[in-house]
Structures are given as structure tokens and as C-alpha cells.
């Protein structure tokens, strides 16, 4: 019976690992992007493990305008680069990000590429890579940060001499409000999935740029945003025809996992 249970557990573990496995491409897919600038989503995540130094370096070595990454708070008041609030999807382990210390998070082994382990990285390391490769840092504020925490993030990047090359993005409008209270002219984009008159009016009023799901953007809305002086970023586009159509429409940025 014990032997049978052990076999069941091993099979379950193998199935879990297989279900989490991701197929990575060996090179980017080139497109006719016109004047649109390309942003590598969570680094070059179509080729490397998302939000890792490997993904950021891979993007840095190519023609991308910007490298996007997600930042969350840790239990000990630090800032880690990771998308999900739980590491289960990327590590196979139930680890809550904001209830873990930076040391614990950096020790977690991620599901790697070609059987090679990967690990998370810090906000400072991400900014350093953007700086090394002269890329715009597109930093998504994932947590619902306090104004004090936003101040700490801004202070850390300012001390590194790279704040002028950072665009803050977030689904949480308060995060961007705090950024603008501290740095009134800082580049900022609001992330949203559907067109909404109230959102449009708010963005135009606050002069916060647009980061919209490509599925929601219409030519009429694009014209309205551009007429108001707002820049438009579409996410997350991995289809060549869709990307080239958006570029022809005149979007400013295309966020992608693999297109270049």
C-alpha cells in the first residue's frame, strides 16, 4: 500500500511539473512595426523565464525600446520582481510573496527552461540591467502600495540615477496618483482592459498615458487619446498580423512576449 501511494505521489508530481512546463522559442519573431516602439513583457518571456535576470538580459541584447517588469512588496519591506502574488504557478510551491522575506523569495527555485533552475530578482537588479543596456524601465506596480512605499521605490531608483528612464504602470490608479504627487511630471501609464468614458476623462485630466488591452482599442478611441496628447501602449500582443495592424493604426508602444 505504501509503495502504491508513493507511486501515486510521484505521478502527481510529474503531472504538476508537466502542466507547468512552458515551451520557449529560440528567437524573436520580427515584424514591420513602423514607428511603434516595442516593449518586452516581463522581459523577453517568450524565450526566457518571465521576470528573471535572464529574460531582462535577453531583451537588453535586442532592439526593444523598453523592458517591462512587475514589482511587489515583501514581508520585510523590500521590493521583489514577480508578477503573481503566489509563486505556485512559476515554482510549483505555495509561497505567498507578501508574506515572505526577500531572502526566502530569492531562495525559491523557479520552474526553469530546459531543466535549468531560475530564481527571482530584486528591483535594484532589474533597474541595473535596464541601465546597463540603456532601456526604458516599464515598471508595473503590482501591489496596492502606500504613498510611503511608492516614495521608497522612487527614492531607490532616483539614487541609482535612472528615474528619468522609468515609466510607472499599474491597474491601481492610486499607485499612479502617489507617483505623480511625488514626481508631477513622471512618465506613467494606466493599465485597463475595456474602454470606459470615465477612465478616458480621468486620464485626459491627469495627463496619464494609456496602457490598454489590444482587444479593446478602437481607431476612434486611439484618435481621442492622441488628440489629448496621450501616448498609447497596447498589451500583450504576440500575433504578427495584430501587431502590424496596431502599428499601422499609429499606437506608440506594443508590449509583447516574443515579437520584435
Residue positions per predicted region:
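Residues within alpha-helical transmembrane segments of multi-pass membrane proteins, especially transporters
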Residues: 14-18
Amino acid at each position: 500500500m505504501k509503495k502504491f501511494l508513493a507511486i501515486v505521489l510521484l505521478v502527481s508530481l510529474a503531472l504538476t511539473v508537466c502542466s507547468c512546463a512552458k515551451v520557449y522559442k529560440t528567437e524573436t519573431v520580427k515584424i514591420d512595426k513602423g514607428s511603434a516602439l516595442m516593449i518586452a513583457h516581463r522581459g523577453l518571456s517568450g524565450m526566457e523565464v518571465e521576470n528573471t535576470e535572464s529574460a531582462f538580459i535577453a531583451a537588453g541584447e535586442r532592439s526593444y525600446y523598453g523592458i517591462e517588469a512587475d514589482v511587489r512588496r515583501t514581508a520585510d519591506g523590500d521590493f521583489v520582481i514577480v508578477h503573481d502574488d503566489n509563486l505556485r504557478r512559476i515554482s510549483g510551491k505555495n509561497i505567498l510573496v507578501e508574506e515572505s522575506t526577500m531572502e526566502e523569495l530569492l531562495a525559491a527555485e523557479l520552474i526553469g527552461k530546459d531543466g535549468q533552475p531560475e530564481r527571482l530578482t530584486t528591483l535594484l537588479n532589474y533597474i541595473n540591467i535596464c541601465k546597463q543596456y540603456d532601456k526604458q524601465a516599464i515598471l508595473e506596480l503590482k501591489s496596492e502600495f502606500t504613498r510611503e512605499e511608492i516614495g521608497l521605490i522612487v527614492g531607490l531608483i532616483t539614487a541609482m540615477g535612472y528615474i528619468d528612464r522609468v515609466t510607472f504602470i499599474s491597474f491601481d490608479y492610486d499607485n499612479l496618483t502617489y507617483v505623480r504627487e511625488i514626481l508631477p511630471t513622471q512618465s506613467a501609464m494606466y493599465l485597463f482592459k475595456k474602454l470606459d468614458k470615465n477612465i478616458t476623462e480621468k486620464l485626459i485630466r491627469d495627463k496619464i498615458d494609456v496602457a490598454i488591452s489590444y482587444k479593446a482599442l478602437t481607431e476612434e478611441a486611439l484618435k481621442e487619446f492622441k488628440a489629448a496628447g496621450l501616448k498609447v501602449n497596447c498589451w500583450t500582443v504576440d500575433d504578427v498580423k495584430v501587431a502590424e495592424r496596431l502599428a499601422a493604426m499609429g499606437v506608440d508602444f506594443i508590449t509583447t512576449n516574443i515579437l520584435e
